[in-house]
Amino acid sequence: MLNEFKSKLENGEFVYGVFVKTSDPMFNEIIGISGYDYVILDTEHGPTDIENQQNNIRACELRGILPIVRVPYIDDNVIGKALDIGAMGIQISQIRCAEDVKKVIKYAKFYPEGERGVCRFVRAADYSSLNRNAFFKKENEKIIIIQLEGKEAIDNLDEILEVDG
């Protein structure tokens, strides 16, 4: 799923997705059946908890749709948990400066690209059946979407765009 999504973007193709604010996995199955490429599971404004998100991610995988979790704020635990439960990417809103972007990357990626906390007994590591190097490589390739908001972000756009990752 992730490679196909990235390939489409690299080839200049459009990808189509839907924001979901419900906790019912059925909606994600229907979206997948309908032919969309991805779904953004909104934990910033939606009523779901981490367990609901994990079930929503399973529904996305079942129907071949890329699950991206929109996390509510920049925090190492929030970002790590979203990725640990199997999200193939994260979206972060309220980005205002390059330092915000650097924090997101640091929290989302494992060493040497970041400082994400390690636990291999999670869904994303196939409950430790993936070896450590394969797990780190897979996780460091996941999608990070930043959402710039406010005048400060626009004023800092050039420095934000210079951040690698």
Residue ranges and their predicted role:
Residues 1-19, 129-140:
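N-terminal amphipathic alpha-helix/helix-capping segment at the start of soluble metabolic enzymes
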Residues 27-54:
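Glycine-rich, proline-tolerant flexible connector loops at the mouths of alpha/beta enzymes
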Residues 77, 89-164:
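Conserved anion-binding
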Residues 20-34, 73-81, 151-163:
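Short, acidic/polar
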Residues 14-20, 39-41, 67-71, 90-92, ...:
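Hydrophobic faces of well-ordered beta-strands that scaffold small-molecule active sites
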Residues 43-46, 72-73, 95-97:
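Short, ordered loop/turn segments at secondary-structure junctions
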Residues 50-84, 108-114, 136-140:
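Alpha-helix-loop-beta-strand connector modules within alpha/beta enzyme cores
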